[in-house]
């Protein structure tokens, strides 16, 4: 059975501004890629953090059955949020430790629901540091943003 990876990225022109998200999904047997799928999308007025979340959500929602997957993101916001902060937010009724509403709560709730049926390993990598798969995800995110940018 191949190992499944999703490399996710978000992009925004202005923050807020037009934005996009991209996902490179790879099925690997050892070092060999046996299947590849790309996803992308965007919005006219959004933030970089929202696009990073949408990339991860879209990767998980694209899976048609319960799956073991490694999601690789260059967003510390997504990685820390989904592996650490979310537990307290849920306990506090989607409020932060200082009782303020969690930003992007509807996307965090969607991500939380999307990951429930899968076995997800979350991995953070440094962005724009020469990781080929992350660079592809960035290209997809920029392509997802392109239709929403005005010249």
UniProtKB/Swiss-Prot annotation:
Domain of life the protein comes from: Bacteria
Domain RNase H type-1: 1-146
PROSITE patterns: RNASE_H_1
Localization annotation: Cytoplasm
Keyword Cytoplasm: yes
GO annotation, biological process: DNA replication, removal of RNA primer
Functional description taken from the UniProt entry: Endonuclease that specifically degrades the RNA of RNA-DNA hybrids.
Protein name: Ribonuclease H
Gene it is expressed from: rnhA
């Amino acid at each position: 059975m191949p190992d499944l990876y999703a490399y996710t990225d978000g992009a925004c022109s202005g923050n807020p501004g037009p934005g996009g998200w991209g996902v490179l999904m790879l099925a690997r047997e050892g070092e060999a890629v046996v299947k590849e799928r790309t996803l992308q999308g965007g919005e006219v007025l959004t933030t970089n953090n929202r696009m990073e979340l949408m990339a991860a959500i879209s990767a998980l929602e694209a899976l048609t059955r319960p799956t073991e997957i490694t999601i690789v993101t260059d967003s510390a916001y997504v990685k820390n949020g989904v592996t650490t902060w979310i537990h307290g937010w849920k306990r506090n009724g989607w409020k932060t430790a200082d009782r303020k509403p969690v930003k992007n709560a509807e996307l965090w709730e969607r991500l939380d629901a999307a990951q429930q049926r899968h076995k997800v390993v979350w991995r953070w990598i440094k962005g724009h540091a020469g990781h080929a798969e992350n660079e592809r995800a960035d290209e997809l995110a920029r392509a997802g943003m392109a239709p929403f940018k005005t010249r």
